[in-house]
Each structure stands twice: as structure tokens, then as C-alpha cells.
Amino acid sequence: MTLLTLNNLSVRRGQCPVVDDVSLKINRNELVGLVGPNGAGKTTLLKAALGLIEHTGNSSLAKLSLKERSLTAAWMPQEREINWPISVLETIKLGQLSPSLKLDKDKIINDALDRTGLTNYRERISTELSGGEQARVLLARALAQNTPLILADEPIAGLDPATQLTTMKMFGDLAKEGKGVLISLHDLNLAATFCTKIIMLDKGQLHAVGNPAKIMTDENLEKVFNIRAYHARTDKGIICQPIEVLSHSY
């Protein structure tokens, strides 16, 4: 089942195209990694897909009313700092303020706490946590929204290696349970290992879409990222470890 459809989506800043004529679909049971160098348009694409910024073309999410959108997609932006001095539990409950179906909200919140490793943090004050811990709180808030689709902008940025791995595994588990997950990433190795589909952007354009083995090729990495990588297959998935910058481009 398709949860998000983009048709010829474009965003311009003045005369400059930031996202240029992108068409794609995100389905249930998919963990999709959105990758590309700095300035490729990843954040802009996510915001346009949600209808948060002006765009041309079509996004199936942006067409929905705010109520329908809040029931369809949860959003975790790149900004991580929490400025309200309330408990972790109260912060996560903010994800359920939008109208929702009649579900066991306490069970959903407890599940979000458990998935993000915050069960013992529920009474801690959010503003007193570290940056990485606050990122996990905001992720739990998005999970508490209990939507079929999750969009997250660099959700593992600033996390320690162990938490990055557990967070990526959690996203994979959510996809296996029937959700669609679209996340932007800078770590190509984690994207290749955990994601079921890769979307590679270059200068705002869709360069390649497909499974990691198909997309994380020397040709694509050299053209888009100007790097060479070590490739291997394991029982955990594809390894794609950057090892060499080909030439300075600045």
C-alpha cells in the first residue's frame, strides 16, 4: 500500500531550483533512506512532501487537511533542542494532542518510551537532558503520534554509535510491522545496512532509487559524493564504507 506519492515536486528559491521535478512513492513495510551531499535538497524535499513549504507539483500528503495529515504522518525535524521545562512523559504526550482514533494512548506512549530507551526517563525534565537524549525524546513524541507514515530529518545525527544502531534497528522494526519510514541520512553505511530502499539526491534532482545493492555503486558514489567506498555483503545487509575522497571540489 502506498502511503506517500510525489509527482513532479519542485521547490525554488528565486530562480534556483532546490528540489527539481522529483517523483517517487513510499509504501508500507519500507524503510527508505534519503541520501545526498550537503545542499542536495533532502530537508527541503521532506518539508515540501509534508506541505510545510511552498512547492509546485503534487504531494499526496500536502493535499490533506491538517487533521488528516496529523493522522497520516509523523514528522521529526532536524532541530533537536527542547525549550519547554516539562517532563519527558509530558513532552511525548504532545504527540497525541492532534485528533486521533480511539486507541490505547497509554500503551502507545509506553511503547514509544520502550523503543527509544526512555522508560526510566519518564519523569525527568526534558530541558535537563543531553542533546542526544533530547533527540530520543522528540523521536518518541513522533512515535506516540501512531501514524502509518514517519518522516524524519537526520534522526540519528548527534547520537552515539550504539544509539544510532538501535535507532536504525527500531526504524527497521517499524517498517516490518507495516509502517512506512522515510529518513534523511548522512551515514551511507547505516543507510546501506538497514534501509530497504535508497533515494539518492544530487543538486535537487532524483539521481537514483532502488535497493541498497543497486544504488550504492562505485559509479553513483563517485558521481554524487565524489568518494570511493568499500563494499561487502553480510548476513546483516550491505556494507558501504567510504574510504577515499577522489578530488577536492571546493
Task: Tell where the protein language model's regions lie, with residue ranges.
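ABC ATPase nucleotide-binding domains
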Residues: 224-250
